[in-house]
Amino acid sequence: MNHSRSHALFAQAQTLLPGGVNSPVRAFKSVGGEPFFVARADGPYLFDVDDNRYIDYVGSWGPMIAGHNHPAVREAVEQSIRNGLSFGAPCAAEVTMAQTIARLVPSCEMVRMVNSGTEATLSAVRLARGATGRNRIIKFEGCYHGHGDSFLVKAGSGMLTLGVPTSPGVPAGLSELTATLSFNDFEGATALFDEIGAEVAAVIIEPVVGNANCIPPQAGYLQHLRTLCTRHGALLIFDEVMTGFRVALGGAQAHYGVTPDLTTFGKIIGGGMPVGAYGGRRDLMEQVAPAGPIYQAGTLSGNPVAMAAGLAMLELVQEPGFHTRLSEATSMLCEGLEDAARAAGIAVTTNQVGGMFGLFFTDDVVESYAQATACDITSFNRFFHAMLQRGVYLAPSAYEAGFMSSAHDEAVIEATLAAAREAFADVAR
């Protein structure tokens, strides 16, 4: 593939943007090489500035569950912008969005719109601290909840990709208020609550870890956390920025049958536009300003164009059988990848929940952060580049989940697996 225009753009970008990108994982530092620059996207495909086409399993890191540039979403945006780009005042679409989320998600009686997943998690934790009168939070190794200071302790996503355990610039006093647990560790959670439970405002968790690749919860684990939080008077926050409306219509909480006190959202509810939200029990959400004393605000929150895009996307995912078909397509991909690796003599296992998946270069079932970080990263990096050269774009880090869309039909998946068979053979050499 020719990447001359991408190469020139990246060289220019590095003189203007830190690392040449506006989000670290995009720079390919984990996998090596240089990123390609995207010119357009359609369906399951990305097209770069050098006119190369890629089957895309990143999907803008999750939002594009119906594929890129879906006509219904595009038309909703085009219609909305005819009426203006931003009002800084209430609009009807905000109400419709809140109604939709509240109807579909078990935990959400009220909703507040924000502009990103990071804003959502920061706001949810502030609400938890204000509502409980406590300061400490518990998070999990490898889970990423945005770049808020409280969350950059043993975080996943770009932090894990770059091998940074805790970011410089986070005051020690603040990081000391964040306790960490190993995901899927029942005994560790019980012991930590026995030690500090009376000080804990909230437990925040990705119910399916998507920022240390894809790690599902063991049977009963989320309910165990629910029980501990209730017993000790702490709030349970599900970060469903990735899992919301993807692993099931009602998110991971509906899929696993565990209802948190608060939930954070992003990605799919914006249809590709910048957006976030948090919601939960009415008695908690009514403590948010101006109804209550816990302050949170945003100039562009509830932006009408973002609401239009998100509502169009949520209409698509409510179509009968949408999530069943998405899960079946993801299973087809994962089973095919394992078969292709096995044929090449490569140790690979996959995890899948609905339309999320993870690819691990190991023989073991991966159920924890420690297992994810023990996988063969060198082989993953070689596989990543072998697939990229064959026109398949996977997440450029061994520590990021993959995302399926409804635009990935059987022919697209078969083309992916044909590329994978060749790529695994390259890795085996």
Curated annotation (Swiss-Prot):
GO cellular component, one term: cytoplasm
A Pfam family of this chain: Aminotran_3
Record keywords, A-Z: Cytoplasm, Isomerase, Porphyrin biosynthesis, Pyridoxal phosphate
Cofactor (UniProt): pyridoxal 5'-phosphate
Reactions catalysed according to its record: (S)-4-amino-5-oxopentanoate = 5-aminolevulinate
PROSITE patterns reported in the protein's UniProt record: AA_TRANSFER_CLASS_3 (PS00600)
GO MF terms held by the record: glutamate-1-semialdehyde 2,1-aminomutase activity; pyridoxal phosphate binding; transaminase activity
Enzyme class: isomerase
Biological-process GO terms, alphabetical: protoporphyrinogen IX biosynthetic process
EC id: 5.4.3.8
Localization annotation: Cytoplasm
Listed pathway(s): Porphyrin-containing compound metabolism; protoporphyrin-IX biosynthesis; 5-aminolevulinate from L-glutamyl-tRNA(Glu): step 2/2
InterPro entries: 4pyrrol_synth_GluAld_NH2Trfase (IPR004639), Aminotrans_3 (IPR005814), Aminotrans_3_PPA_site (IPR049704), PyrdxlP-dep_Trfase (IPR015424), PyrdxlP-dep_Trfase_major (IPR015421), PyrdxlP-dep_Trfase_small (IPR015422)
Modified sites of kind N6-(pyridoxal phosphate)lysine: 267
Subunit record text: Homodimer.
Family, similarity comment: Belongs to the class-III pyridoxal-phosphate-dependent aminotransferase family. HemL subfamily.
Protein name: Glutamate-1-semialdehyde 2,1-aminomutase
Lineage: Bacteria, Pseudomonadati, Pseudomonadota, Gammaproteobacteria, Lysobacterales
